[in-house]
Curated annotation (Swiss-Prot):
Pfam families membership: ATP-synt_DE, ATP-synt_DE_N
Keywords: ATP synthesis, Cell membrane, CF(1), Hydrogen ion transport, Ion transport, Membrane, Transport
InterPro entries in UniProt: ATP_F1_dsu/esu_C_sf, ATP_synth_F1_dsu/esu, ATP_synth_F1_dsu/esu_N, ATP_synth_F1_esu_C, ATPsynth_dsu/esu_N
Membrane association type: Peripheral membrane protein
Subunit composition and interactions: F-type ATPases have 2 components, CF(1) - the catalytic core - and CF(0) - the membrane proton channel. CF(1) has five subunits: alpha(3), beta(3), gamma(1), delta(1), epsilon(1). CF(0) has three main subunits: a, b and c.
Record's protein name: ATP synthase epsilon chain
UniProt keyword Cell cycle present: no
Name of the gene: atpC
Protein task: Produces ATP from ADP in the presence of a proton gradient across the membrane.
Record-stated family: Belongs to the ATPase epsilon chain family.
Subcellular location: Cell membrane
Gene Ontology terms, MF aspect: ATP binding; proton-transporting ATP synthase activity, rotational mechanism
Source domain of life: Bacteria
Keyword Zinc: no
Length: 134
């Protein structure tokens, strides 16, 4: 690792999604987007549903995270995400089906519908579609 990069690890309960040296990243913090360059001051923050943008050797990658925590320390960024997937791994048909289901639940407005859960499902689906370029 050079002094112009930092180690980024994104892990979920199921797997390690990303583990490489990167030059810059932007994470969806709960208080807004957070940019992290090498030698960033130590911090711990919570993450929102959103797209992480990662720069590595002049290329930009996207990883969808659905909440979790991020720690920055000693030129290493560790993301513990509830769920995460690289943009190229996203199954667009599955994300589109999830979007439709969430919209249908929200349109019903019956007492048995958990509105917050449906809104979060919709946000996850829309974020996945956006990351996939849809």
């Amino acid at each position: 690792m050079s002094d112009k990069t930092q180690r980024l690890e994104i892990v979920t309960p199921q797997r390690k999604v990303f583990s490489e040296d990167v030059s810059f990243l932007v994470a969806p913090g709960t208080e807004g987007e957070l940019g992290v360059l090498p030698n960033h001051a130590p911090l711990i923050t919570s993450l929102n549903i959103g797209i992480m943008r990662i720069q590595q050797e002049g290329k930009t990658f996207k990883v969808v995270v659905t909440g979790g925590f991020m720690e920055v320390r000693d030129n290493k960024v560790t993301v513990l995400a509830n769920a995460a997937e690289r943009a190229e791994e996203i199954d667009v048909a599955r994300a589109e089906a999830a979007r439709r289901r969430a919209e249908e639940r929200l349109a019903k407005k019956t007492p048995d519908i958990d509105v917050l859960r449906a809104e979060l499902a919709l946000k996850r689906a829309l974020t996945r579609l956006k990351a996939a370029g849809q």
